[in-house]
């Protein structure tokens, strides 16, 4: 089993070196790839009960690194804050339809900001990442929350919404929360 793991780590290291050597993608991508490679090894070595929390934290660090490379630290903070707000609204202890109304109202305000009706305190770099992380995943999350289809925790929600590849790949496929 360790031999297979070593082979995967070697392939990941070679891939990382090739991406740097041939200047593939952006600097943010290269940093996130290096972070992912190191994170992969740590994640594999951790006991199972710590892995989802570690993945969530790794994803947040990747988001901060990717936005920071672009000089957009404030946007990373805004993205984390807005994401935390939406996750929090999904769990407010009020009737489910009232939670949906709060989320629809909040996202309606965000849509108005995106359309330029109201000024947003961040630049345009935030919107693609925010949409990729919350648009479709939010609907899946709310459905699974309503039907109790999967276990829910803050660690799992953070790992699900801020999932590491999404910060560099806004068109990353939608992941089913139950299968996550």
Task: Label every model-predicted segment.
Residues 1-10, 27-28, 44-50, 94-96:
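N-terminal membrane topogenic signal
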Residues 16-30, 41-48, 65-70, 88-91:
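Short, hydrophobic transmembrane alpha-helix segments
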Residues 9-14, 30-33, 53-55, 151-152:
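Short hydrophobic/aromatic-rich motifs at helix boundaries and adjacent loops
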Residues 1-5, 9-19, 35-42, 82:
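Low-complexity, highly charged intrinsically disordered N-terminal segments
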Residues 10, 19-23, 30-31, 116, ...:
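Residue-level signal for well-ordered alpha-helical segments
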Residues 2-7, 27-35, 71-79, 128:
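Alpha-helical transmembrane segments of polytopic membrane proteins
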Residues 15, 27-37, 136, 165-166:
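Aromatic-residue hotspot detector
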Residues 53-180:
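Intramembrane catalytic core of multi-pass membrane enzymes that act on lipidic substrates
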């Amino acid at each position: 089993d360790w031999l297979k793991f070593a082979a995967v780590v070697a392939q990941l290291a070679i891939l990382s070196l090739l991406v740097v050597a041939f200047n593939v993608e952006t600097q943010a991508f290269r940093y996130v790839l290096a972070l992912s490679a190191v994170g992969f090894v740590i994640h594999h070595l951790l006991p199972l009960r710590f892995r989802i929390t570690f993945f969530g934290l790794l994803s947040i660090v990747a988001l901060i690194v990717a936005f920071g490379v672009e000089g957009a630290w404030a946007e990373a903070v805004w993205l984390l804050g807005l994401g935390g707000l939406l996750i929090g609204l999904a769990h407010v202890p009020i009737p489910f339809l009232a939670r949906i109304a709060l989320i629809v109202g909040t996202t309606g305000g965000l849509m108005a900001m995106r359309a330029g009706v109201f000024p947003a305190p961040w630049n345009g770099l935030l919107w693609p990442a925010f949409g990729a992380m919350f648009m479709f995943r939010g609907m899946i999350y709310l459905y699974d929350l309503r039907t109790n289809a999967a276990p829910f925790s803050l660690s799992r929600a953070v790992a699900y919404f801020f999932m590491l590849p999404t910060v560099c790949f806004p068109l990353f496929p939608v992941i089913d929360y139950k299968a996550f």
